[in-house]
Curated annotation (Swiss-Prot):
Entry GO CC: AP-1 adaptor complex; intracellular membrane-bounded organelle
Highest taxon in the source lineage: Eukaryota
Biological-process GO terms, alphabetical: protein transport; vesicle-mediated transport
Location within or outside the cell: Golgi apparatus, trans-Golgi network; Cytoplasmic vesicle, Clathrin-coated vesicle membrane
GN (gene name): ap1s2
Pfam families: Clat_adaptor_s
Protein name: AP-1 complex subunit sigma-2
Organism in which the protein naturally occurs: Dictyostelium discoideum
Record-linked InterPro entries: AP1_sigma (IPR044733), AP_complex_ssu (IPR016635), AP_mu_sigma_su (IPR022775), Longin-like_dom_sf (IPR011012)
Protein task: Subunit of clathrin-associated adaptor protein complex 1 that plays a role in protein sorting in the trans-Golgi network (TGN) and endosomes. The AP complexes mediate the recruitment of clathrin to membranes and the recognition of sorting signals within the cytosolic tails of transmembrane cargo molecules. Also involved in early steps of phagocytosis and macropinocytosis.
Assembly information from the UniProt record: Adaptor protein complex 1 (AP-1) is a heterotetramer composed of two large adaptins (gamma-type subunit and beta-type subunit), a medium adaptin (mu-type subunit) and a small adaptin (sigma-type subunit).
A GO molecular-function annotation: clathrin adaptor activity
Similarity comment text for this entry: Belongs to the adaptor complexes small subunit family.
Transmembrane segment boundaries: none
CDD domains registered for this protein in UniProt: AP1_sigma
Length: 154
């Protein structure tokens, strides 16, 4: 299973987070974000969360005011992708304490760090929430210590 990209969109259509795992031009990225945003935001809530789009499959889930959107290959399992999205949201919730859109706006670098610990090159790398949270906590501790205070255990 390979993700081509992941988008977090607000209900107003603003992009809050993007991660591209396949090579696309900036023009394509902009067009894809706009097209997919329109498809997802205008879709009635009673319909399913899977869309066929070009040679890909779009899988999305709404949590509060944010849409988590993943583009993957057509042969990938939709339910596993939904579980990965839910896994990411659970980690964000534990880290931020009931994550909201403002958390992602003001702490986008931490959201990207969490995503990078979870998914690498479009593939799920870490399934343990505790491991991801421990690594993020270590990163926070490292960043909070001032210059010259970093300890490296060998």
């Amino acid at each position: 299973m390979t993700f081509h990209f992941l988008l977090l969109l607000s209900r107003q259509g603003k992009t809050r987070l993007t991660k591209w795992y396949s090579p696309f031009t900036n023009k394509e990225k902009s067009r894809f974000t706009r097209e997919i945003g329109n498809m997802v935001l205008n879709r009635p809530p009673k319909l399913c969360n899977f869309l066929e789009w070009k040679e890909y499959k779009i899988i999305f889930k709404r949590y509060a005011s944010l849409y988590f959107v993943v583009c993957c290959d057509r042969e990938d399992n939709e339910l596993i992708v939904l579980e990965i999205i839910h896994h990411f949201v659970e980690i964000l919730d534990r880290y931020f304490g009931n994550v909201c859109e403002l958390d992602l706006i003001f702490n986008f670098h931490k959201a990207y760090y969490i995503l990078d610990e979870l998914i690498m090159a479009g593939e799920l790398q870490e399934t343990s929430k505790k491991t991801v949270l421990r690594l993020i906590s270590q990163q926070d501790t490292l960043l909070e210590g001032g210059p010259g205070e970093h300890k490296v255990d060998l």
